Regions:
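N-terminal amphipathic/basic helix or basic patch
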Residues: 3, 13-17
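N-terminal first-folded block
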Residues: 16-35
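Short amphipathic alpha-helices in soluble, non-transmembrane regions
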Residues: 23-24, 79-85
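Short, surface-exposed ligand-recognition loops at beta-strand->loop->(often short) alpha-helix junctions
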Residues: 10-14, 70-73
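Short, conserved charged micro-motifs
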Residues: 16-19, 74-79
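Vicinal oxygen chelate
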Residues: 3-7, 31-32, 38-41, 46-53, ...
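Phosphate-centric recognition/catalysis
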Residues: 67
Length: 125
């Protein structure tokens, strides 16, 4: 017997703000919204649904889990695009011939933008 991921859930203060940000960042569609939550789905059916659930407390420590996002073009282009949507750069990492940018969404949740094909990244076959 095994488990499969059904939904990726974000605790947040404002579900609509995060749903709007992640919808624009990932190209996901808004599936629903109510007073306590918003949810998105990947129109291609490949990605997990995202649920944004209101909680009373704010974020106070580093995420224990985060998203690593691979751009279709370059890391620099994607970092600039998500910055325009409301993300901020937390730090840039260059370790052992790997590099990525750690970013924060509008509520401070960490995510990483990795190298893309224009940066020399090649998918493993």
């Amino acid at each position: 017997m095994s488990l499969s991921v059904d939904t990726l859930t974000f605790d947040c203060r404002d579900p609509r703000v995060l749903a709007d940000f992640w919808s624009a960042a990932l190209g996901y569609e808004l599936q629903g919204i109510d007073e306590e939550s918003s949810w998105l789905r990947d129109p291609t059916g490949r990605g997990w649904p995202l649920l944004f659930l209101i909680v009373p407390e704010g974020k106070s420590v580093k995420n224990r889990v985060h998203l690593d996002l691979r751009p279709e073009t370059s890391m620099a282009d994607e970092v600039a695009r998500v910055q325009a949507l409301g993300a901020t750069i937390f730090r840039r990492v260059d370790e052992n011939e790997s590099f990525w940018t750690v970013m924060l969404d509008p509520e401070g949740n960490e995510f990483c933008v990795l190298r893309g094909p224009e940066d020399g990244w090649v998918a493993a076959e």
